Amino acid sequence: MAINPITRNKIKDYLNSFIQQQLSVYRERSLREFQDVDSYLPSLSKDGDLKPFHASLIPASIMRLNRFERSLSTGLGSTFEECTRLIALDHHAVALRNYDIQAALDQAQWAAIDQLISIIDRGLKHQTPSLNQMLEQIQSIPLTGILETHIVRADLYIQRHDGSELFFEIKSPKPNKGQCLEVMQRLLRIYTIKQQSAVPVKAFYAMAYNPWGISRASYRSSNTKKYTDFSNAVVIGQEFWSLIGEPSTYTELLEIYHEVGLAKSAEITQKLLQ
């Protein structure tokens, strides 16, 4: 078993608390019901969430459920980060969220990273260079002798028992262009900071699941493929969770999410459909 019973319970408690918090927020938010045109149109909303056409067609309880689902989906990314941390602690020496690396590098190296990202952004290369190609460019530039200190934050940091290090940026599997460029910049900075490390270092853009299917070959995001080193920098679904734990980690974690969902489904329906 990749996720031991104690960790399973910690994950369940965390997910229960997450859903409860989401429910509390949405139970407290009033939703203007559509009784008739004359009473609805003069309504005011400080949140800018009046939708006269939606409200006239869809019952308020269903609208509330829809809002809850969208909010839950937005916040779900934070649950992936915490679950990876909890699982990783069972398999590795260290696992930390929001891990900061502070380093002083030559001014020319920071500038070279930004220039490479700008080249990718403007599409000046037919294909995004590999991480290794970009790192070779960064390491070969003439240095100025002027040091600049920057802080780079990783969503998740893991130190394995052999001392090797893993850095993960855990982001949406359907990123926009800006998100891809931001992650690539961060990965290049991490690798450049760690270039003299005595232990092996790997940094990845991690996606908790693949929206197009189970296999890597089925993945279809054009932004990811165009603006990242997809072959070497990106890990998706099971390949990501296997790095965190074992080959069965992904399916075991999904089972935990499902168990929590089944246990909370009646409460969610009752509270949001009232």
Curated annotation (Swiss-Prot):
Pfam family, one: RE_TdeIII
Effect seen on changing residue 176 to S: Greatly decreased specific activity. Greatly increased specific activity
EC class (word): hydrolase
Cited function: This system is more active than isoschizomeric RM.HgiBI.
GO annotation (BP), single: DNA restriction-modification system
Family named by the database record: Belongs to the TdeIII type II restriction endonuclease family.
Protein's name according to its UniProt entry: Type II restriction enzyme HgiEI
Its EC number(s): 3.1.21.4
Reactions catalysed according to its record: Endonucleolytic cleavage of DNA to give specific double-stranded fragments with terminal 5'-phosphates
Assigned keywords, A-Z: Endonuclease, Hydrolase, Nuclease, Restriction system
GO-annotated molecular function: DNA binding; type II site-specific deoxyribonuclease activity
Gene it is expressed from: hgiEIR
